[in-house]
UniProtKB/Swiss-Prot annotation:
It catalyses: CMP + ATP = CDP + ADP; dCMP + ATP = dCDP + ADP. Its EC number is 2.7.4.25. It is an enzyme of class 2 (transferase). GO terms for biological process: nucleobase-containing small molecule interconversion; pyrimidine nucleotide metabolic process. It comes from Nitrosococcus oceani (strain ATCC 19707 / BCRC 17464 / JCM 30415 / NCIMB 11848 / C-107). Belongs to the cytidylate kinase family. Type 1 subfamily. Keywords: ATP-binding, Cytoplasm, Kinase, Nucleotide-binding, Transferase. This is Cytidylate kinase.
Length: 227
């Protein structure tokens, strides 16, 4: 790790398990954690709340610059709690429609520029673990360790389906797989900060791995050993 405040980035597509892994690493190291995707989801939710269309870049830029968002780390194994304008929105931002809206506004240069410095401000001692789609390529290109976590579209849809069923929310597996494929296309083809692995990232396919197995495989990398 560098002498500067160290950063570990975990990038990857929706449903790859990057958020779970990043939180586990942050808890293990007792570092700060940033869910960058949640910032776009919160912005999408705020835009809907204030009647701002997803194709209004200037209005979204202003909203992003003044976004009243707060993250509170969850207990071990639990996701971070997210607050928008003082109200908890942890569940609301995880809905499929919010994720799809976030993917659309994330393609806007004005939005990404407005959130860039806010994301970098999370870099505080003793260190930061962050997950997203461009953490290792754009936000923290100098990160000490970059991980790109992926999984097959079907497996990612299956995981999402299981999550929704456990929450009592109805879902269709085939529709989820189509939505994930469409989101992948948008994320990979956008002109600004497309989803891709950094040249110096370690790529890990989690399709056939349990959460604990992914974590155990990554642990040695913290000391510079990718075995």
């Amino acid at each position: 790790m560098s002498k500067e405040i160290p950063v570990i980035t975990v990038d990857g597509p929706s449903g790859s398990g990057k958020g779970t892994l990043a939180q586990q690493l942050a808890q293990h190291l007792e570092w700060h954690y940033l869910d960058s995707g949640a910032m776009y989801r919160v912005l999408a939710l705020a835009a809907d709340k204030h009647g701002i269309a997803p194709n209004a870049p200037k209005q979204l830029e202003t909203l992003a610059q003044n976004l009243d968002v707060r993250f509170i780390s969850g207990l071990e194994g639990m996701p971070a709690r997210v607050f928008l304008e003082g109200s908890e929105v942890s569940d609301s931002i995880r809905r499929e429609e919010c994720g799809n809206a976030a993917s659309k506004i994330a393609a806007l240069a004005e939005v990404r520029g407005a959130l860039l410095m806010r994301q970098r401000a999370f870099r505080k001692a003793p260190g930061l673990v962050t997950d997203g789609r461009d953490m290792g390529t754009v936000v923290f290109p100098e990160a000490d360790l970059k991980i790109f976590l992926t999984a097959s579209p079907y497996e990612r849809a299956r995981r999402r389906y299981k999550q929704l069923k456990e929450k009592g929310i109805g879902a269709n597996l085939k529709n989820l797989e189509k939505e994930i494929a469409e989101r992948d296309r948008r994320d990979c083809e956008r002109n600004i900060a497309p989803l891709k692995s950094a040249d110096d990232a370690i790529i890990l396919d989690s399709t056939n791995l349990a959460i604990k197995e992914v974590f155990q495989q990554v642990l040695p990398w913290l000391s510079g050993k990718n075995t």
